[in-house]
Amino acid sequence: HVPVVIADRMDGKTEVNPQFTPDYIYAGRTLPDQREDGVEYILDADVWQGEDGTWPAFNHAQLPLMGECNAELKFLFMPYMAQTDEVIACLKHHPEVVIVSQSNHPNRLGEHRALVHQLMTEGLQNPVVFFQHYSEDDAENLQIKSAADMGALIFDGLCDGIFLFNQGNLSHAVVDATAFGILQAGRTRTSKTEYISCPGCGRT
């Protein structure tokens, strides 16, 4: 499977660029009245009602609730430091859980990588989506920083998905396009045609 893209739409603005349509939209606590075709939605577990095309999201403090939930797909937001024996035991019984790896560590790359390696050590095969948060107002700055944060994880073959969250003044379309661009640059998912010039004659 190609890596998935999760996009933030907690502000209720659900419009997407057809060329860069995310696989999942994280809507937080409110499902929008108008949903995009072909997109599945993620809601916080305590407000999720089992609507078609929606899935619950849990945090690591909600393990008992997650174990009782009968959804076929669940998302677990979890930092590396929360990877306790209890969490590992729960994941071994719930292969349907997608882990959304979070980090506030100065070395985010190292902590994301450590989480995946710990899962491997425990023999777990749950998919891992990397959550990367920024506060950028300039598209180029977002592209550079997010590509640097994600590049090594992609080339190491550790990336099952990407979730870019930006609190700056950039449109959702820019953030979505950045996520797809990173995956295309890593040769893990193609979303647009690339034109490459011949190094000899310059023709495309």
Regions of interest found by a model, annotated:
Residues 35-42, 168-188:
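C-terminal helical cap(s) of enzyme catalytic domains, especially alpha/beta-barrels
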Residues 18-21, 108-115, 146-149, 171-179, ...:
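General structural feature for long, well-ordered alpha-helical segments within catalytic domains
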Residues 98, 156-171:
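Glycine-rich phosphate-binding active-site loops on the catalytic face of alpha/beta enzymes
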Residues 1-110:
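Active-site beta->alpha loop and helix N-cap motifs at the rims of alpha/beta catalytic domains
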Residues 26, 129, 161-164:
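Short hydrophobic alpha-helical runs that function as membrane-insertion/retention elements
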Residues 29, 70, 91, 116-123, ...:
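Structural signal for hydrophobic packing residues in well-ordered secondary-structure cores
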Residues 13-17, 86-90, 110-114, 137-154:
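Catalytic cores of alpha/beta
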Residues 111-116, 120-137, 174-177, 188-204:
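Small-residue-enriched alpha-helical segments and adjacent helix-cap loops
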